[in-house]
Amino acid sequence: MLRQLLATARRLLLPLATPKRCLSSKPNGLDKSEYSTPPEVIDYEDPEGLPVPEYPVRPDEPLATRKQRLLYQSRKRGMLENDLLLSTFVAKYLKDFDEDETALYDKLINGVSNDWDIYYWATETKPTPPEYDTDIMKLLKQHVKNTERVQRIRQPDL
């Protein structure tokens, strides 16, 4: 009895479990024309009454300590895109920054309240505001273009 029940259930349910091939008039079933142009960026402005805490200024911080803090903050942004871009950027350039360049980089990554803004500016999806359009931002944009075609699939080792 149990054997008959299982055989009937298998016969009825097996066709439902097997994958079916979809037939399409397009080769490979893909229409790549819809992916050739990037979609428009949907970006919402922050509400007026939204309190954004000011980042504390550290005027007496030694340069070596500041660079260590910026290295950590560049690796731990909260969004993978910026983690990869900024961590590879600081691995390549931060050690050669002087005090002024380090301060500009500090202002760039800590003065902006939205990480997506940094990403859009660096990828040149949105125009960079004048207060952040510095030599450091130009260097970051050049780094993001990746003219050397370096693979950036993970953060560099510490």
Swiss-Prot record:
GO cellular component: a single term: mitochondrion
Key words of the record: Chaperone, Mitochondrion, Transit peptide
A single BP term in Gene Ontology: tricarboxylic acid cycle
Keyword Lyase in record: no
Record bears the keyword Mitochondrion: yes
First and last residues of the transit peptide: 1-23
Subunit structure: Interacts with the flavoprotein subunit within the SDH catalytic dimer.
Function: Plays an essential role in the assembly of succinate dehydrogenase (SDH), an enzyme complex (also referred to as respiratory complex II) that is a component of both the tricarboxylic acid (TCA) cycle and the mitochondrial electron transport chain, and which couples the oxidation of succinate to fumarate with the reduction of ubiquinone (coenzyme Q) to ubiquinol. Required for flavinylation (covalent attachment of FAD) of the flavoprotein subunit of the SDH catalytic dimer.
Similarity annotation: Belongs to the SDHAF2 family.
PANTHER family: PROTEIN EMI5 HOMOLOG, MITOCHONDRIAL, SUCCINATE DEHYDROGENASE ASSEMBLY FACTOR 2, MITOCHONDRIAL
HAMAP family: SDHAF2 (MF_03057)
Protein name: Succinate dehydrogenase assembly factor 2, mitochondrial
Organism: Drosophila virilis
